[in-house]
């Protein structure tokens, strides 16, 4: 069985890990970094960049650079409009009210864009392992609903990965944290504040069993929001001074975003930071600069409401787990945003203990995913992971009431059946409206699917017996069936993401992604070849200066002619011509080297001017110093 890689598909950064023996290890990307920015960029020449190369060009190409796409996974456009309005790229409504990113004349779904990031992770792992990778465990925020989980699975399929398991980020973190503590029984709280989402989970660890007792969170709270309060402050300051809103200009907004993120990071270790953005925007034909000093105290004041929003989910998670604060043995911080000092202070104050510093908050989730991959392949034994669903699942019943079949924080996988009936006499069919949430009425919860069970024989109301079964798998993805117990007729539905992507669409996107993967590989090979040519030009010119006077006119002329050909091929970026010219230079140098070697051999033969007939009999005195034993 091949390796199953673990991928933390993050809002801001992504990370990939794999089991090596009994250890999970993070795999560095092609830039040598252990995490990869979750950013995709499209260039005017049709080239696509992912990760650090995409991030580096964002300021000059803001409308075609996509970041934080995870915030739109499995969402409806109408429910994410406020977030869409803050993006530098253009989001518009697609079919079924799904968000689509407009790039030139093409629309991309969040799944397609996430797949490009997953492809980068897949390629990173393949280059490290030296073989193709086909399977992965991918993490999601614990509070992701069914549609968001399904969308993540679709992204994996488009990227050419078989997603063996979707697991919750805090659970993955606890798995990585607790692997070397198998002999110790403990209750841990995982406080996970990432780039776009916040989760808190309470788990019991003991004898290799990792049991999630409860989970809670907010999928609209993360590091991006902390950046936004700085952006709004900077834009507000500039507007009050100059009368212009920088957020209306995509390039200026992108510069604000990068400056805000940098300032936030610096304030984790400094009391203040200077934000200096020269030539941010012309006002009345005059270039204007934005120079501001932001103190940590001011940042904490701006972010105060965001910080307080993390505490209610902590209270609810403890309540749902039936535990008091004093029963929590360890608090684990996950996600880059937990580096904010005020967050650490509030967590310590709430739980009454210092959070554990034993894990890297940027890497621990991917490590946990890799461990889960190891469990599935059998590389990791004696580990049992018991996760839960974050939100209740049920159906709409008479009067618009939401009737729960599977309660929140139920251990998965899980299966539950309940019998319902018709609401009117001789009702020929029933509509099963599947929902997810905690509110009493259907209209206040999230609709995740509908289907019909027809051909019900005529009968008075409440007589037909319709058995509805909810079956939720280990990925937290739901299958629903409805069966008329009288006739045995059954209808099933696998709840698909509200993305509305059909199997054909997913297959089409997967084929496109595969084609692009080949194109990306070719582009990379082309760049490497061009770099080799550049290096050979430099080395050849250097060697001609050094050894030119030792070469015969013929050999020197051959090298110079081949060098000229290589320069022309390099300028034209003609790979075939580069290969030919490089081969010609190598051949010419081989001939020249042979000539120089023969000349040197001839100079050292008997009969040379030195008149020596053998090794010299003379002895040269050298100084000798005995080394003291202590210095050895």
From Swiss-Prot:
CDD domains referenced in this protein's UniProt entry, alphabetically: ASKHA_NBD_HSP70_DnaK-like (cd10234)
PROSITE patterns for the chain: HSP70_1, HSP70_2, HSP70_3
Keyword Ion transport assigned: no
Gene Ontology molecular functions: ATP binding; ATP-dependent protein folding chaperone; unfolded protein binding
Residues covered by region (Disordered): 595-632
Pfam families: HSP70
Transcription regulation listed as a keyword: no
Segments of skewed composition (Low complexity): 601-614
Residue(s) carrying Phosphothreonine: 197
Acidic residues composition-biased segments: 620-632
Entry-linked Gene3D superfamilies: 1.20.1270.10, 3.30.420.40, Actin, Chain A, domain 4 (3.90.640.10), Substrate Binding Domain Of DNAk, Chain A, domain 1 (2.60.34.10)
Keywords from the UniProt entry: ATP-binding, Chaperone, Nucleotide-binding, Phosphoprotein, Stress response
Family annotation (InterPro entries): ATPase_NBD, Chaperone_DnaK, Heat_shock_70_CS, HSP70_C_sf, HSP70_peptide-bd_sf, Hsp_70_fam
Expression triggers: By stress conditions e.g. heat shock.
Family: Belongs to the heat shock protein 70 family.
Main function: Acts as a chaperone.
NCBIfam families registered for this protein in UniProt: PRK00290.1, PRK05183.1, prok_dnaK
HAMAP family assigned: DnaK
Protein name as annotated: Chaperone protein DnaK
Naturally occurring in which organism (per UniProt): Cytophaga hutchinsonii (strain ATCC 33406 / DSM 1761 / CIP 103989 / NBRC 15051 / NCIMB 9469 / D465)
């Amino acid at each position: 069985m091949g390796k199953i890689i673990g991928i933390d598909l993050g809002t801001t950064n992504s990370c990939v890990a794999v089991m090596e023996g009994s250890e999970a290890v993070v795999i560095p990307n092609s830039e040598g970094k252990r995490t990869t920015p979750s950013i995709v960029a499209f260039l005017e020449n049709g080239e696509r960049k992912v990760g650090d190369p995409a991030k580096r060009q964002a300021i000059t190409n803001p409308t075609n650079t996509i970041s934080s796409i995870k915030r739109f996974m499995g969402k409806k456009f109408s429910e994410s409009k406020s977030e869409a309005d803050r993006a530098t790229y253009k989001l518009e409504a697609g079919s079924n009210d799904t968000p689509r990113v407009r790039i030139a004349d093409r629309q991309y779904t969040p799944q397609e864009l996430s797949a490009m990031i997953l492809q980068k992770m897949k390629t990173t792992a393949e280059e490290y392992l030296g073989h193709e990778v086909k399977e992965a465990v991918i993490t999601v925020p614990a509070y992701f609903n069914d549609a968001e989980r399904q969308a993540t699975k679709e992204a994996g399929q488009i990227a050419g990965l078989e997603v063996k398991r979707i697991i919750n980020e805090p659970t993955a973190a606890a798995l990585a944290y607790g692997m070397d503590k198998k002999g110790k029984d403990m209750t841990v709280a995982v406080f996970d504040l990432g780039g776009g989402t916040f989760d808190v989970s309470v788990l019991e660890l003991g004898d290799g069993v990792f049991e999630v007792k409860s989970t809670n969170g907010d999928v609209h709270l993360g590091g991006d929001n902390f950046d936004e309060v700085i952006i709004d402050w900077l834009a507000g300051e500039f507007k009050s001074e100059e009368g212009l809103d920088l957020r209306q200009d995509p390039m200026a907004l992108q510069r604000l975003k990068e400056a805000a993120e940098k300032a936030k990071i610096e304030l984790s270790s400094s009391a203040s930071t200077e934000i200096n953005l020269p030539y941010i925007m012309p006002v009345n034909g005059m270039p204007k600069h934005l120079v501001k000093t932001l103190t940590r105290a001011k940042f904490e004041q701006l972010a105060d409401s965001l910080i307080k929003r993390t505490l209610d989910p902590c209270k609810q998670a403890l309540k749902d787990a039936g535990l008091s604060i004093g029963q929590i043995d360890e608090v684990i911080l996950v996600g880059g945003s937990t580096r904010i000092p005020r967050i650490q202070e509030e967590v310590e104050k709430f739980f009454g203990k210092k959070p554990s510093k034993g894990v890297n908050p940027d890497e621990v989730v991917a490590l946990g995913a890799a461990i889960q991959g190891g469990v599935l392949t059998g590389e990791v034994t004696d580990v049992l992971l018991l996760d839960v669903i974050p939100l209740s699942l049920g159906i709409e019943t008479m009067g618009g009431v939401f009737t729960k079949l599977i309660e929140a924080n139920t251990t998965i996988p899980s299966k539950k059946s309940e019998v319902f009936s018709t609401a009117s006499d001789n009702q020929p069919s029933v509509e099963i409206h599947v929902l997810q949430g905690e509110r009493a009425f259907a209209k206040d919860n999230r609709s995740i699917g509908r289907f019909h069970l027809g051909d019900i024989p005529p009968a008075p109301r409440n007589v037909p017996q319709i058995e509805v079964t909810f079956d939720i798998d280990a990925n937290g993805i739901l299958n629903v069936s409805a069966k008329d117990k009288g006739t045995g007729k059954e209808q099933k539905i696998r709840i698909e993401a509200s993305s509305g992507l059909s199997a054909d669409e997913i297959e089409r996107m997967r084929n496109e992604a595969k084609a692009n993967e080949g194109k990306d590989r070719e582009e990379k090979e082309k760049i490497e070849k061009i770099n080799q040519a550049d290096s050979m030009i430099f080395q050849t010119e250097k060697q001609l200066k050094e050894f030119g006077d030792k070469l015969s006119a013929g050999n020197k002329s051959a090298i110079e002619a081949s060098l000229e050909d290589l320069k022309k091929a390099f300028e034209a970026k003609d790979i075939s011509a580069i290969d030919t010219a490089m081969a010609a230079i190598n051949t010419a140098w081989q001939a020249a080297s042979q000539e120089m070697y023969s000349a040197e051999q001839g100079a050292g033969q008997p009969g040379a001017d030195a008149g020596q007939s053998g090794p010299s009999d003379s002895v040269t005195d050298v100084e000798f110093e005995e080394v003291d034993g202590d210095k050895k």
